[in-house]
């Protein structure tokens, strides 16, 4: 029967600085590189080959309390190239670039704890075929109020709006 021969290389970098500059508690940075390939083999022949190379980076800034609000804000960027070849290939080669801004804040008001979050994503997918390229945005946000009305008891109200951008395979 068919089987898969897979190879993956991944490199990660993570760093954190305490009190990097005035007004901020922490600066966190992450970066990664992934090189992935798998062959779908039937008998002794590779029928389809998937190759994917990608980079991702993220920077977060944790700020000191500001009007009693505490939180983190950040940016994230990624790039991925996907190439599928062979007799049974169903995906066109493509490149995806994605950029994001995000933030999470929280504050205590007596017995109430308020949490707010937001994220804005921009994504562009260039497809090497007659398929139309994709260029779009997604905006998500959430809010929560937690009421500690009695020791060991909490009542929460949570609301959110989530948007998701398509993966290149979904186009």
Set out the residue ranges of the language-model regions.
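Face-selective signature of the C-terminal outer-membrane beta-barrel domain
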Residues: 5-148, 153-154, 158-160
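A flexible loop/linker signature enriched in serine peptidases of the S9 family
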Residues: 162-164
């Amino acid at each position: 029967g068919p089987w898969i021969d897979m190879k993956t290389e991944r490199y990660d970098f993570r760093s954190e600085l305490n009190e990097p500059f005035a007004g901020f508690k922490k600066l966190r940075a992450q970066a990664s590189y992934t090189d992935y390939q798998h062959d779908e083999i039937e008998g002794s022949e590779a029928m389809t080959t998937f190759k994917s190379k990608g980079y991702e980076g993220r920077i977060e800034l944790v700020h000191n309390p500001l009007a009693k609000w505490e939180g983190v804000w950040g940016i994230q960027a990624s790039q991925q190239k996907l190439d599928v070849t062979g007799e049974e290939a169903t995906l066109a080669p493509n490149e995806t670039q994605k950029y994001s801004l995000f933030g999470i804040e929280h504050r205590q008001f007596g017995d109430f704890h308020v949490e707010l979050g937001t994220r804005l994503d921009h994504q562009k997918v260039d497809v090497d075929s007659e398929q139309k390229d994709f260029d779009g945005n997604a905006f998500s946000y959430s809010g929560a109020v937690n009421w500690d009305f009695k020791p060991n008891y909490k009542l929460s109200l949570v609301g959110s709006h989530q948007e998701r951008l398509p993966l290149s395979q979904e186009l």
